[in-house]
């Protein structure tokens, strides 16, 4: 029960996963097993160097960006960067879900029958299992969590698959809990992707052959294995050391110099890792701590043991049968924030002894746990400012906007003129809110908040309300101070990152159940207006404010002083999208048709031939009639 509580899987599920993983090696692509109401998909492990580093990939670690339109959740919202993964592993997934196999149809069948799905694999088959799980989450689970049961991914000695953003995205979506990775103490495969391709490529094929259990056994004195192990662990040390220096904010001069002339591996652990020794299992959820353990668990103070570790790094890759069989009898420890590194036979301190963790290793793990603790503390600090944000936004909605509307020019134009005391108060609140949201964005960009923060519905909603209410004031201030004349268009040179971040968070949240991305949705709407070829329209709209409703006023300011014929396409685009923005709450229709508003004044100058046929015409008439009564 304790094991299942910590990992999300029980011993029986692990045993079946292992048996299926072994059986998958006799297949071309995958093995499907049904046990009770659960369907197991196990993937074959390939020991070909081409399946570790894609042949045409010239990057130092065989990496490639995941395509956002295929994996829209696998990205950083704060930094607007897509996940990096190993290209060879990704290609294996693409073959798997393509027409050459029955895998896609088999998964669809399991989903239709509401069966739980487990993806599993040993060695490099585990890499496929990890990406197949991500594909399932993006294709089925995110779109209908009630119809698609929660998956599980169980791997044995799998290599690392993706970068920090891969780890972060899984954490943001609360998907990390679905991944459980078993690692024997010295197994080299979970460390291989931390080495540079140029470091290991000459001996890689030979070592992969030794990792294949169907081939001839290795000897303790095999010098090629020793050289390979040494090179992998040298690079692993550099990655782990640089990572811990970043955690404690203390860059060592040697590491700074080293990383300046060659890149370090981007790959990072994801999910839960279960490290195994002869006596116990150690469960770890902290990715930073796992990275440190991947290096330090392969060290030893015993001279005799140290000399045979290269041999053990291959032998342990073949030791998962024994691990699985002993799950029920081994001691169990959990390394986390709430488990101090104490002594005693069943303590985490004793577990670290079994893993050969030195004093330096424990300091590095402590730094990783402290960094996690600090991220939690940072979130608590941000949470204390929620009431301040709500109070300031409420004043804008309940006091400032109604008073401005009573003057028939709206809060956008009133703020631009800034003739009233309330305009000054609004500016103070605007500046205060900017400080809070800039602080939040700074923490997000630096990874100093828990991964789940970006996915918090409460903060997404609050940031959206902030963007919709306050960005028009920033635009008003920008144009009121004539910054557009000195600096250029607001959308090109003036829009603060805090609004872009809030926009991305909102769009991601509402679109992820559809599997679509904001850019594609926008162009689908624009193409529906039938204004011309998309290529031509893209050139016209490249610096426009039509991609976001809270930028409505920025687009109006850019268009209002130009001849109608010159901006006809941009205006029709704005006009065509406005109905949806009003419906979604992005634009307040009470504001735009007030007699003194910038938009209404510009609207009145447009040709009657356009206004009569415009989609806004009936709405304008209705608003006028409502005010008249």
UniProtKB/Swiss-Prot annotation:
Any GO BP annotation: plant-type hypersensitive response
Origin: domain of life: Eukaryota
GO cellular component: cytosol; EDS1 disease-resistance complex; nucleus
Matches recorded under Gene3D superfamilies: alpha/beta hydrolase
Keywords: Cytoplasm, Hydrolase, Nucleus, Plant defense
Single GO molecular function: hydrolase activity
Reported induction: Up-regulated by salicylic acid or upon turnip crinkle virus infection.
Keyword Hydrolase in annotation: yes
Active site: 123, 187, 317
Disruption phenotype: No effect on RPS4-mediated resistance against avrRps4 bacteria, due to the redundancy with EDS1.
UniProt subcellular location: Nucleus; Cytoplasm
Keyword Metal-binding included in the entry's annotation: no
Primary location group: nucleus
More details: Ecotypes cv. Landsberg erecta and cv. Di-17 express a probably non-functional truncated protein comprising of only the first 162 amino acids. This protein is not expressed in cv. Wassilewskija.
Function: Acts as a second functional copy of EDS1. Can mediate HRT-mediated resistance to turnip crinkle virus.
Assembly, per entry: Interacts (via N-terminus) with PAD4 and SAG101. Part of a nuclear complex made of EDS1, PAD4 and SAG101, that can be redirected to the cytoplasm in the presence of an extranuclear form of EDS1. Does not interact with itself or with EDS1.
Record's protein name: Protein EDS1B
Lineage start: Eukaryota, Viridiplantae, Streptophyta, Embryophyta, Tracheophyta
